[in-house]
Amino acid sequence: MAIDLIQEIKTQFQNVEKGGVFFIKQTVMLEEIYGFARENTRFAEGGCCDEANEAEYQLLETYWGRRFKFGGLAGYCHGGRTALGAVSHHVPESEGQKNLLLVAGAHIGYHDGQWGQLPRTGQPGVTTSCGSLAAIVGAGYDAIRNKPADALDRQQRTVEQIILPYLEQCARSGDTPDIVAATRHLMQQIDADLEKIVADLKSGFTGQIALITGITINTVQGNFFSPTRVEVFGRS
């Protein structure tokens, strides 16, 4: 049952909600308090490219209009300053108001009490989620530290370098790397880097910027969301 599942998820992510419910609440808040509307808002999404995350992004896209994508593997903001600077010039204006809605974050699967696991339609076994992050955690510190750079795998290289300090800490302490802890470590970096990029945007963007970040939990009963930041900048 969904109630039992959410209680299990709350053992690791206490503020979790059903993904769709959470984002509907944020949509109402942005409309009623800050004046966001389809005609004055550009929605930009920085999640992982894994199709398991699509339900909530498609929900938001249906409401706010076509999305700009600045994420990639593992939900890191690979588009960086260039992508977010670009989308800040794509924002529609209506009656003197324009708004930029940024949604981003990492993700992790949960199935039968196991974190980092997710069954997928049409596949007989259970897969990993996030696959990018699971590969790094499974490889371990020495393998990632000594892995040569690959010009055809730059996004994965970026995620590896973000997770490397966590893997080193585990290696030094003798602890086994944990997918939940690695996901949190990645999420902290996403939040820190987006904070810097949004600070840059605020100096040149005359509208409001809503930043919603957090960890999506993928399950066979749908996605859940554990927010880490919900902020609106630039309100007069």
Label each PLM-derived region with a short phrase:
Residues G47-A52, H107-I108:
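Short glycine-enriched loops at secondary-structure junctions
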Residues A52-L59:
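Short, solvent-exposed amphipathic alpha-helices that sit
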Residues L60-K69:
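Short helix-loop-beta junction
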Residues M1-T41, L73-N99, G109-S236:
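Divalent-metal-activated hydrolytic enzyme cores
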Residues L102-A106:
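N-terminal, polar/Ser/Thr-rich
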